[in-house]
UniProtKB/Swiss-Prot annotation:
Motif DXD 2, chain ranges: 215-217
UniProt cross-references to InterPro entries, sorted A to Z: Glyco_trans_8, Glyco_transf_8N, Glycosyltrans_8_dom-fam, Nucleotide-diphossugar_trans
Keywords, ordered alphabetically: Cell inner membrane, Cell membrane, Glycosyltransferase, Lipopolysaccharide biosynthesis, Magnesium, Membrane, Metal-binding, Transferase
Pathway: Bacterial outer membrane biogenesis; LPS core biosynthesis
Name of protein: Lipopolysaccharide 1,2-glucosyltransferase
SUPFAM superfamilies from the UniProt entry: Nucleotide-diphospho-sugar transferases
Species for this entry: Escherichia coli (strain K12)
Gene of this entry: waaJ
Reaction(s) catalysed (UniProt annotation): UDP-glucose + [lipopolysaccharide] = UDP + D-glucosyl-[lipopolysaccharide]; alpha-D-Glc-(1->3)-[alpha-D-Gal-(1->6)]-alpha-D-Glc-(1->3)-[L-alpha-D-Hep-(1->7)]-4-O-PO3(2-)-L-alpha-D-Hep-(1->3)-4-O-PO3(2-)-L-alpha-D-Hep-(1->5)-[alpha-Kdo-(2->4)]-alpha-Kdo-(2->6)-lipid A + UDP-alpha-D-glucose = alpha-D-Glc-(1->2)-alpha-D-Glc-(1->3)-[alpha-D-Gal-(1->6)]-alpha-D-Glc-(1->3)-[L-alpha-D-Hep-(1->7)]-4-O-PO3(2-)-L-alpha-D-Hep-(1->3)-4-O-PO3(2-)-L-alpha-D-Hep-(1->5)-[alpha-Kdo-(2->4)]-alpha-Kdo-(2->6)-lipid A + UDP + H(+)
Amino acid sequence: MDSFPAIEIDKVKAWDFRLANINTSECLNVAYGVDANYLDGVGVSITSIVLNNRHINLDFYIIADVYNDGFFQKIAKLAEQNQLRITLYRINTDKLQCLPCTQVWSRAMYFRLFAFQLLGLTLDRLLYLDADVVCKGDISQLLHLGLNGAVAAVVKDVEPMQEKAVSRLSDPELLGQYFNSGVVYLDLKKWADAKLTEKALSILMSKDNVYKYPDQDVMNVLLKGMTLFLPREYNTIYTIKSELKDKTHQNYKKLITESTLLIHYTGATKPWHKWAIYPSVKYYKIALENSPWKDDSPRDAKSIIEFKKRYKHLLVQHHYISGIIAGVCYLCRKYYRK
């Protein structure tokens, strides 16, 4: 990169339990880029893909800044039980401090940019997924997807995001074209030839950068006119926050349907949180119960945003005492943070 310091990315672990006679000519390569808070989510996401796609070859790549022995043991078990190849990389984030981050998203959101660059040295195509994406169907069609000259196949973001993106990025041409970056199927050679990682980092380092969703916004700016749009089934966006207004907790069925292939649980509340006890997260629970993480306790609130979400959901679930206590905890953290 011309204007960005070299980033250290090292392979730390790799497991290959594929059968000796496996045909590797057709393989769906899947990558994740996360910090320590999302590692377990990656494990369950991988499990969900395996459960629904045992008929195809799968290779998984994870880029993270921190790992732990517990994760190593569980991901190795997942690889062995399902005859997978899984490769882990560690990224040194010291030189990423110049990039913007938010209260909700850490600088791990940029790991995908380095994943595209690194894996492009050995792979032709790659399916990138956020850790909060759960598979509930057959995605093998991607193996034979014609990109028709496009750099990436993506799914348009939900309608409320379209006009906001146009206003935020001052680009009317993005209306109806703004995509969600949680599911991206990429031609890595075209990405590299266009030097898109370098260009993205250059934009992100600019003093004029006012992106609300830095990684997603910059990818939309750079890939404008270079994308192929996939149907909503490949990135069905569902926000657990919507359960706060749905007393029946059945409205998710209007979005997550029989034809849905990939569910993207966006928002601060994730399906692995202790208070996410709704029918809409059953697809995550199915994968969890079939994974090495099945005996782990659900995640409790850590950040102030999670504390805020927790008390609201507890009250909706009629856990009034625990909800009030959680609300007090949130207010105390909010007050003492000032």
